[in-house]
Amino acid sequence: VALVTDEHVAAHYLQPVAESLRKAGFDVLEVVYPGGEGHKNLSGAEGIFAQLIEAGLDRSAWVLALGGGIVGDMAGFVAASYLRGVPYVQVPTTIVAQVDSSIGGKTGVNHALGKNLIGAFHQPELVFVDTDTLRSLPRGELVAGMAEVVKHGIIRDAELFSFLEDRIEEITEMSIGADALDWLIARNAGIKAAVVSADEKEGGVRAILNYGHTIGHAIEAATNYTRYRHGEAVIFGALAVGEIAAQQGVLAPDVRMRHDALWKRLGVPQGLASVQAEAILQRTRADKKRVGN
């Protein structure tokens, strides 16, 4: 098993997970890389490939992704590409990974011209979730991860949306009880799994999962993946989509009010005014979902 994680997650969970695997009879290759969007690229993947090749891993090997969404994307891409594909397992440790990115088989790395432009669909054999890992996350990471949860409530689940209106602060402060947290993660994972099952390769309904992401990804690219977490950029994107929908008359004023209020309670990052609108618009033209001109 190639156990792939980043430096931050390794400090918390690498040795317990590696030891557990060894006790179960697995040979474990520990692969630790710097992490972050700035290393989620072909150069970063090349470093992981080199370690797998040097260790002599063959097609019977598995890759285990231990960490957040970036680790899952990177390790999944490596698994999809190494020897034309080996099995992999997702062990997500952040909200965004547990409710969204670990489910559905999207893997990929960034290019200087856009986010996730190089990748493959490669389904994990297993997704193993331990919600206790969420309680060690800094608040900023929790807020960013909750962007995907709010998104699910908006696009698919009125009951979930109402739950978030009642308890969003409990979640971001991690004062929420264990049972409620387990329900929240399971509910969201179920939403993502249902959409993906209906449209694995994003030819139709799966596109709704990109709510707020077209503009969000463009903001990330326009700021060189250094200013905002992914979820923070999605918050901007969702608010922009709400404005566009309202202008087009497809979002009722009362729903718009609830929509914007929940995003603002989650927390809108600062500093976007310094980013040129044209730079953001230009990045949307390189979006992987773009059709035609």
Question: Predicted segment positions?
Answer:
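Residue-level signal for inorganic ion chemistry
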Residues: 3, 41, 92, 130, ...
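ATP/NTP phosphate-donor binding region
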Residues: 1-62
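Short glycine/serine/threonine-rich phosphate/pyrophosphate-binding segments
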Residues: 12, 70-77, 98-99, 217-218
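A glycine/threonine-rich phosphate-anchoring loop and its flanking beta-alpha core
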Residues: 77-169
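C-terminal charged capping/lid subdomain of soluble metabolic enzymes
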Residues: 2-6, 147-150, 250-293
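Internal helical hairpin/lid segments
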Residues: 214-258
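A generic, well-ordered mixed alpha/beta core segment in the N-terminal half of proteins
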Residues: 63-66, 70-84
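Oxyanion-binding "anion nests"
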Residues: 168-227
